[in-house]
């Protein structure tokens, strides 16, 4: 009986594993089909304008064969080798893109700039599955960790890569649709222009689905399409200015025209989706003003949509079309942004190989040298286009970088003020024992921006002095956004402890930048109360008091500190902090972004001198 039972259990486990594998394969195939439009839409429309974009004079058969050779090796080296085989493995818990690679580097080395976003030591680290920097660091890592200039340059590189990707999302709808309709053309690097998009869109799909779609469909289709165009142009050497449509047989010309136009419209989705992803990453890491982010899938947290970002892209795209007027200038701008994003990816990927993967320096050189030479050649080609429209992505990137820097500077100044004026536990006791101060029924979550263990911000003293009260059970809550994509549910509520006076506690809620935050749906209040009863509360009486406070009502209190810019404030602070206040006033409140009901929100305003 024992042996028979063992065999049956083994067969059940084996059958379950097979069903799981089948489900995984079928899901990957479905996702691979979806990537054909969302991720690779721009890449498959490149035959519309690659040949016509070239300034050829009396081309010969050798010229066309040479051009096709460059196309083939560009697709193979950048598309297959760089992105499919290497870059897709440099994901941060399923999230891709330049900012995700920067996050990955920050997890394995002390190279972050923001103190509030640092990777905690083994003693401070709360999340069980987060990598802790350990072992003997290499020379490169020691150099970057010890040099603030190198760390700032690395952050600037990641920010520029993200901003260039957003600039790509602005230019893509214009160049793709206009190319399908009237032959407006992009630059030569567009042969592989969507390779970066498939990396940034990794959070929307999966690594295996992207690899399946590219290798089984996209790559062979493009190789054959360009080969067919080249064969036609060898026999019709003067037709390169309209190489795609003249290559199409006349009976199917109009159906192909309609399909190409529709495909060009869909092609814009790849960079638009990538823009949503990188904006969401930067918002959660507090490098960008808060915008609304909607999760469009219950199964994949990486599938997001931002209405405000979408409208911003629409307005900028229309502005680009109206401002340029000439499609060639749009193409010039497009070429600059595409190749610079590729170059930044190459640099960050090299650092990932050396610092995280521990790849031998010889293998890294075999990767870096060929791709650096190839992409440097493309950079030299597009540099001539900067004055003829290529300045647009630089202008967009500088504007976005200015927004990010202004937001970061203001947030950092607030953090410094909180650290310098924090309310100690002794001071809290004095405030609560002051004349006329009462404890009122209910459970209060008092939010603190402190990330290093200090729960009590200056807003607390301002609140007690003016309201003359504090809830019977008050939990000082810190939201800790870690430089990881997702946090396991069991690691969500951490550092639960008592903070001196009766009924006053502290805890930390941990989230990664790809996590959806919804306090009501996730019942965070219930999780915190459960953690208090399990880890802190002594005796039934205190436990019942906590439950009674929750039943009496939950309120979420958040301080809203503003800068008071006076006449004696230095000019640099006056400009940057004024810019931050403008951004802060225009962006969304943090509490609605957490899914907290309107009737439970209280914001306490406080001014302090800059």
Which residues does each predicted region cover?
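The structured alpha-helical core of multi-pass membrane proteins
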Residues: 1-610
